[in-house]
Amino acid sequence: KYAEALGVQKDELLLSQPDTGEQGLEIADALVQSGAVDIIVVDSVAALVPRAEIEGEMGDSHVGLQARLMSQALRKLAGTLNRTGTIAIFINQIREKIGVMFGN
C-alpha cells in the first residue's frame, strides 16, 4: 500500500531475489539488454554474495571475490546501459568497525 501511495505501479514492477551475486547481475544484464526497463535498482551490493562464497565452507577465505564480481559486472553493464539509455542504481551500506574512529 505504501508503494501505491507513492505512485508505484505494482503491476509494472519487476522484483527478483536471486540466490547468488552472479545470478542477480546476470538478471540485471538481461533486463538492460532487452530494453524492457528504463531503470534498474540493485539493493544492496553487500547482499550480492559470490557463488564461490555460498558454495564454500564456513571460515573459507574469499578475499576480493565480491570486488572482482562487481568490477566485471560493471564493465559488462556500462556499455549496455549507455546503448539502451537505462539508468542503474546500486545501493550499498556503510559498515563500521567497532572501536575505530572516522578516518582510521
From Swiss-Prot:
Principal location: cytoplasm
Gene Ontology CC annotations of this record: cytosol
Protein keywords: ATP-binding, Cytoplasm, DNA damage, DNA recombination, DNA repair, DNA-binding, Nucleotide-binding, SOS response
Signal peptide, first to last residue: none
Compartments (UniProt record): Cytoplasm
Record has Ribosomal protein as a keyword: no
PROSITE patterns hit by this protein: RECA_2 (PS50162)
Molecular-function GO terms, alphabetical: ATP binding; ATP-dependent DNA damage sensor activity; single-stranded DNA binding
GO biological process annotation, one example: DNA recombination
Protein name: Protein RecA
